[in-house]
Amino acid sequence: MKTARRRSRELAVQAVYQSLINRTAAPEIAKNIREMSDFAKADEELFNKLFFGTQTNAAEYIRQIRPLLDRDEKDLNPIERAVLLTACHELSAMPETPYPVIINEAIEVTKTFGGTDGHKFVNGILDKLAAQIRPDEPKRR
């Protein structure tokens, strides 16, 4: 059974994905997501923080992610890009959530929506990103 927080992360990634693909305004995307049947089981506050925070800071987040990529950013699968941007926001703006939790949640969301091995790629990038964004947080190993 998915937690309300997992559903919020999934819905935030879907919203970021829609913004990347459709170039629709964030308020319209959020309205459409809120009308989905799954939204009733989500943490609305977390969804709002993740989606709108990612939208506001996406350019900065892609600058942080770009040097860690093994390919051109334009070659990123849109789902992987949405997951990386959303997780980057959570790592940057939500220090109350331990980074291993953020990475694990991003992996699970990628397994749900992404390609076959997309979760491995996301894991590798987020491990490096977490070390840069949260250098003082205790290591999980």
From Swiss-Prot:
What does the record give under GO molecular function?
RNA binding
Q: Which InterPro entries match?
A: NusB-like_sf (IPR035926), NusB_fam (IPR011605), NusB_RsmB_TIM44 (IPR006027)
The Swiss-Prot or TrEMBL record describes its family as follows: Belongs to the NusB family.
| BP GO annotations | DNA-templated transcription termination; transcription antitermination
What does this gene product do? Involved in transcription antitermination. Required for transcription of ribosomal RNA (rRNA) genes. Binds specifically to the boxA antiterminator sequence of the ribosomal RNA (rrn) operons.
**PANTHER family membership:** ANTITERMINATION NUSB DOMAIN-CONTAINING PROTEIN (PTHR11078:SF3), N UTILIZATION SUBSTANCE PROTEIN B-RELATED (PTHR11078)
Tell me which Gene3D superfamilies the record gives. NusB-like (1.10.940.10)
Quick one: a GO cellular component term? cytosol
- A Pfam match is NusB
This protein's name: Transcription antitermination protein NusB
Give the UniProt keywords, A-Z.
RNA-binding, Transcription, Transcription antitermination, Transcription regulation
Organism domain of life: Bacteria
Organism in which the protein naturally occurs: Neisseria meningitidis serogroup B (strain ATCC BAA-335 / MC58)
